[in-house]
Amino acid sequence: MYKLSKRLIITAITLILVGTIGWVSSYTTSHHITIEDVEVMLANEHAHHGNAADHSEDSHNKADYASDDTAHDHGKAHAAMIHSVHKADHPEEAGHHNEDFHKGSTHGGENRSEEGSHQVDEHAEHVLHQMHNRPYAALYVAAFFFMMISLGVLAFYGIQYAAQAGWSPVLFRVMEAITYYLLPGALIVLAIGLWADDHIFIWMDPEVVAHDKLIQGKSGWLNKKWFAIRGLIFITGWSLYRYFSRKFSLAQDQANENDNRNFKKNFKISAAFLVFYIYTESMMSWDWIMSVDPHWFSTLFGWYVFASMFVSGITVIALITIYLKAKGLMDFVNDSHLHDLAKFMFGISVFWTYLWFSQFMLIWFANIPEEVTYFVTRIQDYNLPFFGMLILNFIFPFLVLMNSDYKRVPWFIVMAGIVILFGHYIDVFNMIMPATVGDRWFIGIPELSAVALFLGLFLLIVFYSLSKAPLLPKGNPFIKESEQFHY
């Protein structure tokens, strides 16, 4: 029986406090930034980039002048031809156009200067809004990341019951503990989304919707009331399955040796849950992630998010199992169990990469403007995290976990697991940040504080749940097979 240690409690509470203080500090700091501060910042950036660009562009501009002049002369000739034809067809307007030209020559400079000033003001306001968005987005990314770990584990747990897998029952208590975080974690994600409003979901701004016909066409789905209702339906369904599955699992431990009624109940509700899950997970990914870019959509997106949460969840199962085994609390877990967990980490990492490439390749080569813009933004403004996550989520685990022997080495699995989790945090970061903060991204105090806050909360809830039941589900009819499992 695991006992929640004081050291872990202190560590978790410290993470929560430090994370809360750091995030609140970054939130208040960002909201003290004024439009004047942003204008000064943009002027400094423009001066810095302008000086750097002048030297690099001189030679390029000289080479382009000839072709530019030719094109310009052709344009003037074309304009003159159109103007002369227009004068011939409408001689009565010629004088009027000449008069307008003289008026424009005296006022054109003033109008251009007013338009330029207006554009600068609009850009500064846009940047200010992005900077205000950053604490909200950082909190949302961290909240969603830890929630999706729990949801991924719940799916894996349901699959084990529905498949009547014989190797995994020794890991069920770890899975049940991780899924205990799902209810509070999912409610927090939904609450942040509703509270942040248009700081994360631009379609929650009525003024934007009023001027955007595409979002208006989706308003039957993308509206705040139904967003909240759907979210509560998702969370209720997931939580009910988790509650009854845990209840039947514990009841099976108290049942007579040949009484498997609770196990059969778990089998039935797990099969039903997986049907519910595959639909609601897709709709959740549309609502909670894809709708931050309301003009963009991908039919693969639900599967893509599923792969990310699935491999992240399995990785956390492996890390907690290794920790408890090192403490001498799970001696019934052997190298073959770790080997199978590492196989899933390896296999789902490859599956995630397949989905990433399929989605990217189809959209990129189709080159449809409203679709390809999603990736253009990320390649231009998020080049390092966008391509860096491929190394973290595919290349590194592929190379480290390819060898069968390495899948049995705990520290190898831990090393690969930490990299995989960091990589999938970056994946969620890449999905949320471009639409909310644009090119004003950075992994700093808001992001690190939010991760610390939810990491502390996750550890506290998960290990509290671990302490509430024996680590070995002795009543499971496959427990002997699981204990003797050897690959």
Regions found by a protein language model. Name each.
Residues 1, 5-32:
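Hydrophobic secretory-pathway targeting helix
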Residues 1-4, 27-29, 156-177, 195-205, ...:
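Juxtamembrane membrane-water interface segments of multi-pass membrane proteins
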Residues 20, 73, 89, 98, ...:
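Long, contiguous internal "core" modules enriched in hydrophobic/ aromatic residues
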Residues 20, 279-283, 418-429:
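Aromatic-anchored segments of alpha-helical transmembrane domains
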Residues 24-135:
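Low-complexity, proline/glycine-enriched hydrophobic segments characteristic of transmembrane helices
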Residues 26-41, 143-254, 273:
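Transmembrane-helix bundle segments that line or gate the permeation/cavity pathway
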Residues 150-155, 187-188, 231-243, 307-322, ...:
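Hydrophobic cores of alpha-helical transmembrane segments in multi-pass inner/ER membrane proteins
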Residues 299-305, 370-390, 438-462:
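Membrane-interface transmembrane-helix boundary segments in multi-pass integral membrane proteins
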